[in-house]
């Protein structure tokens, strides 16, 4: 089990020989207009073009700082598969990503990448990419179950009883990626 943090919420996880990239954001600015919106303080520690082959991308929700259009399109062009919460597939289709390259999951639904089981689990948050589309897509955390190790990625979340339920169903976890702030 290995994990490399690339800043903010972007993490590369390697488990059972499978490389998973969580909420990849490699753009300098994540905004519909380049002069507004969240901006990186520091460049990522690796260029997007220097990443190793990624088996799957996991997206927690549709906020601009978690679902980066430019990064997503680049990875999709490389043939990368995406696991996303319900509703986010509409963005991927709009960005010309083939439906065969992604799966949308509801809370408690899962799929496998190799021998690794990925479960879309609850989070206490909200969604939306503008002032006019709040809560039209699902937000999530993710439980990642390998043959011997387990990872929990919280996504953006507040504390709630969902942590106990996730831990009861899928824990204990060997690595927890908890978003703070």
Task: List the model feature ranges, each with a label.
Residues 70, 125-181:
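Active-site-proximal loop/helix segments of hydrolase catalytic cores
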């Amino acid at each position: 089990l290995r994990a490399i943090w690339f800043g903010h919420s972007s993490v590369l996880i390697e488990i059972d020989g499978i490389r998973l990239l969580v909420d990849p954001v490699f753009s300098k600015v994540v905004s519909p207009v380049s002069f507004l919106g969240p901006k990186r303080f520091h460049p990522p520690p690796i260029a997007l073009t220097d990443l190793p082959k990624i088996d799957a991308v996991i997206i927690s929700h549709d906020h601009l700082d978690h679902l980066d259009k430019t990064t997503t399109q680049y990875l999709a062009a490389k043939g990368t598969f995406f696991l996303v919460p319900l509703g986010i597939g509409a963005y991927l289709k709009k960005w010309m990503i083939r439906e065969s390259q992604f799966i949308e999951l509801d809370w408690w639904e899962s799929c496998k990448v190799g021998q690794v089981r990925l479960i879309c689990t609850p989070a206490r948050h909200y969604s939306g990419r503008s002032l006019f589309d709040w809560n039209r897509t699902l937000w999530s955390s993710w439980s990642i179950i390998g043959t011997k190790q387990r990872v929990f990625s919280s996504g953006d979340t507040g504390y709630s009883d969902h942590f106990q339920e996730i831990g009861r169903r899928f824990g204990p976890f060997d690595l927890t990626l908890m978003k703070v702030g």
